[in-house]
């Protein structure tokens, strides 16, 4: 992997993922942030090590190159859950069913988050239903398989120690 380091800004250029900025993170979490053309929030790689080699770079590159497709798949998963399990979003059956019938499900501002191996998520930071405030709704995957949809309203921000 060809990496050029800018020591002052903690930015590396990764051959497959572009420029990655190492973010100061709490505790033993290491976070790299990258950009995705056309996707305002970009992506994060969150690891237990600062070594990017533990990330599945080829997998991440494939997801971010096809980010719009994956965003649409995640929105379709949300649409199904709104209709079948509105309680996941703390919504009534009627509100969930009505939201699921909208032409565009009102979830926006996707941020792609990758972990070790092929675990990843798309976190929709904003939505028109007031769900998941203030952290959003996370659609989680292992590889291409959906593993869960989570309302992040009960999440807590991790503070530096």
What are these regions (language model features)?
Residues 2-33, 102-161:
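Acidic, proline/glycine-rich low-complexity IDRs
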Residues 52, 62, 69-70, 80-132:
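Surface-exposed, interaction-prone regions used to assemble/regulate multi-protein complexes
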Residues 1-95:
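Long, contiguous N-terminal structural blocks used for assembly/anchoring
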């Amino acid at each position: 992997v060809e990496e050029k380091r800018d020591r002052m800004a903690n930015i590396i250029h990764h051959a497959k993922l572009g420029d990655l900025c190492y973010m100061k993170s709490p505790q033993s979490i290491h976070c790299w942030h990258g950009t995705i053309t056309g996707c305002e929030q970009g992506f994060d790689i969150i690891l237990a090590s600062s070594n990017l080699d533990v990330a599945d770079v080829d997998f991440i590159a494939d997801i971010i190159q096809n980010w719009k497709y994956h965003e649409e798949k995640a929105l379709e998963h949300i649409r199904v859950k709104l209709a079948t399990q509105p309680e996941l979003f703390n919504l009534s059956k009627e509100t969930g069913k009505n939201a699921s019938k909208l032409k565009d499900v009102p979830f926006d501002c996707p941020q792609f988050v990758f972990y070790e191996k092929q675990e990843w998520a798309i976190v929709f930071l904003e939505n028109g239903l007031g769900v998941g405030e203030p952290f959003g709704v996370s659609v989680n995957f292992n590889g291409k398989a959906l593993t869960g949809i989570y309302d992040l309203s009960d999440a807590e921000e991790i503070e530096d120690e």
